[in-house]
Amino acid sequence: MSATARKTAPNAQDIRARKGGVPLVSLTAYTTPMARLMDGHCDFVLVGDSVGMVLHGLNSTLGVTMEMMILHGQAVARGLDRAMLVIDMPFASYEEGPAQAFRNAARLMAETGAGAVKLEGGVEMAETIRFLVKRGIPVMAHIGLTPQSINTLGGYKVQGRDDQAQAVLADARAVADAGAFSVVLEKVPATLADRITAEVAIPTIGIGASAGCDGQILVVDDMLGFFTAFKPKFVKRYADLGPLAEAAIAEYAAEVRARSFPAAEHVFGDQAPAKGAKA
């Protein structure tokens, strides 16, 4: 479904209005077929920069480019009709300053039909968020564990424990005050996530946070069991499709080598079939 035909999808203000209501549901998507599967079940779908690790085999999100995000954003947009499309701003596309962020955010939205962008950072990104929002770019913030900053955070560690809690809380307040319509809380203690949810006026979207958040998001390949390089503690595997897919591929390979595929029902005869029969 093209972005211009998506008349029923919620917008940023609709998502913001869900604060304190029925929890928001979100997953990542990178392809049209997967977007179609989740369209009727998610309030918004995120084209995450996790695509670099999940589909492109990178060991972090740092190598993801604008071109990659646009390509996958366009693919996901074709599969959505009812869910809002949000797209990640990749590393080095917005940190230089508000003007750089606006150029790249506007390009992402214009070329993909996304209804909002997501960017990582708290207090240090408040000025940029405010700049974007004032110029018509809805922003979903992302604080706590910010994967684009793993080299300075020392890896994929829980953020906001002990004396770090006040800093994460300050980040949440800053992005809300700057005009973000929602904020992702990644890998923070549940008690801190609950406090942030209670104190900020915008919806909190948890990933490794708390069931008390205003919504939840997971990487779809994690929860379906396709991505097996590692499994974060916060992931629940609702299906284990990776082994099923591998078993199907192994069966196909065995049948090809045994010449049992294709069978008679998979090939075409010399004569045209009778009218109404399958070719």
Curated annotation (Swiss-Prot):
Q: Which Pfam families match?
A: Pantoate_transf
Q: Which CDD domains match?
A: KPHMT-like
Where does it mainly reside?
cytoplasm
SUPFAM superfamilies in the record, alphabetically?
A: Phosphoenolpyruvate/pyruvate domain
Quote the record's binding site residues for 3-methyl-2-oxobutanoate: D49, S50, D88, K118
Cross-referenced InterPro entries, in alphabetical order? Answer: Pantoate_hydroxy_MeTrfase (IPR003700), Pyrv/PenolPyrv_kinase-like_dom (IPR015813), Pyrv_kinase-like_dom_sf (IPR040442)
Assembly description: Homodecamer; pentamer of dimers.
Q: What is this protein called?
A: 3-methyl-2-oxobutanoate hydroxymethyltransferase
Organism (species): Ruegeria pomeroyi (strain ATCC 700808 / DSM 15171 / DSS-3)
